[in-house]
UniProtKB/Swiss-Prot annotation:
Residues that, per the record, bind Ca(2+) 1: D110, N112, D114, R116, E121
Known role: A membrane-associated isoform may be involved in the exocytosis of zymogens by pancreatic acini. May regulate calcium-dependent activities in the endoplasmic reticulum lumen or post-ER compartment.
Name of this chain's protein: 45 kDa calcium-binding protein
Free-text domain note: Binds calcium via its EF-hands.
Principal location: Golgi
């Protein structure tokens, strides 16, 4: 069953907000430092690939800390801070306009208008942006479901989906449909057969009782986006543990979690990448995933960690995000700090010398 935590609405005085917004606008207009935009080519490539394979469950899920293949989601913090505004901070954006946008976001997160962001305010914002990603997934799912339900009966069988999937891989749709109808063996390569097997397992899991192998629109959403379905989230966790678990005990040790991926390059540049891989995953394992710090991550711990609507996780993330930029150690995020560490929050470095902000202001 797809579930979503409802977000409480927040109200503020229009006069207070206007004054607050003017203060931020004045602050941003004072800054003329040069900007160095981040490289978003990977994100764009991933989005393009997603458009081409819209009926295939994505490896990347917005607002979820792990990819389906077990890799860390490098865009996670930007996704839960910017929500649908991520595209507004790409390499083509004008720096001053981007700074202004960032300050507008700051004012929205700063509910009590005290010109600083607390962990609680950031937590609520993260939950709001995560819900925003989910609503976007629901919207997109309606289009994807129509693509696999051409007769519009509100249900999709496994065979109907299989035809559409293979057609998206370049096979002749009519020939595939005829072969399935006549119970003939499909002429597909071994890799495609393996993918079909994995998709069938996921299809069965998304089929809510009583199982009929026909997916409704909501069930198809769970099929494509397991992160927002309790049963499918468990299935996703099992899949990740299965791929990383080397001794078959159905849990993960630190060595298993930080093991280097297959095909590791052997030159020095590759070694540097490997070192970063180990460092990042070790930090994530010890500080966030292994909640009882016993050196072992159970499926329950991994599920809690990956649950995008877990409020406790959102609070921990909020504290960590603030700590990254909290130079004055007051446990709050201030305008100068978020601008100086803009690359962490937006993917773009919007100014080089944040100290000039305070001096000029």
């Amino acid at each position: 069953m797809v579930w979503l935590v409802a977000m409480t609405s927040r109200q503020r005085s229009l006069c207070g907000l206007a004054a607050h917004g003017l203060w931020f606008l004045g602050l941003v207009l004072l800054m003329d430092a040069t900007a160095r935009p981040a490289n978003h080519s990977f994100s764009r490539e991933r989005a393009a690939n997603r458009d081409e394979n819209e009926i295939i469950p994505p490896d990347h899920l917005n607002g979820v800390k792990l990819e389906m293949d077990g890799h860390l989601n490098k865009d996670f913090h930007q996704e839960v801070f910017l929500g649908k505004d991520m595209d507004g901070f790409d390499e083509d954006s004008e720096p001053r306009r981007s700074r202004r946008k960032l300050m507008v976001i700051f004012s929205k997160v700063d509910v009590n208008t005290d010109r600083r962001i607390s962990a609680k305010e950031m937590q609520h914002w993260i939950m709001e942006k995560t819900a925003e990603h989910f609503q976007e997934a629901v919207k997109e799912n309606k289009l994807h479901f129509r693509a696999v339900d051409p007769d519009g009966d509100g249900h999709v069988s496994w065979d109907e989906y299989k035809v559409k999937f293979l057609a998206s891989k370049g096979h002749n749709e009519r020939e595939i449909a005829d072969a399935i109808k006549n119970h003939e063996e499909l002429k597909v390569d071994e890799e495609t057969q393996e993918v079909l097997g994995n998709l069938r397992d996921r299809w069965y899991q998304a089929d809510n009782p009583p199982a009929d192998l026909l997916l409704t629109e909501d069930e198809f959403l769970s099929f494509l986006h397991p992160e927002h379905s309790r049963g499918m989230l468990k299935f996703m966790v099992k899949e990740i543990v299965r791929d990383l678990d080397q001794d078959g005990d159905k849990q993960l040790s630190l060595p298993e979690f930080i093991s280097l991926p297959v095909g590791t390059v052997e030159n020095q540049q590759g070694q540097d990448i490997d070192d970063n891989w180990v460092k990042d995953r070790k930090k994530e394992f010890e500080e966030l995933i292994d909640s009882n710090h016993d050196g072992i991550v159970t499926m329950e711990e991994l599920e809690n960690y990956m649950d995008p609507m877990n409020e406790y996780n959102a609070l921990n993330e909020a504290k960590q995000m603030i700590a990254i930029a909290d130079e004055n150690q007051n446990h709050h995020l201030e305008p100068e700090e978020i601008l100086k560490y803009s690359e962490f929050f937006t993917g773009s470095k919007l100014m080089d010398y944040a100290r000039n902000v305070h001096e000029e202001f």
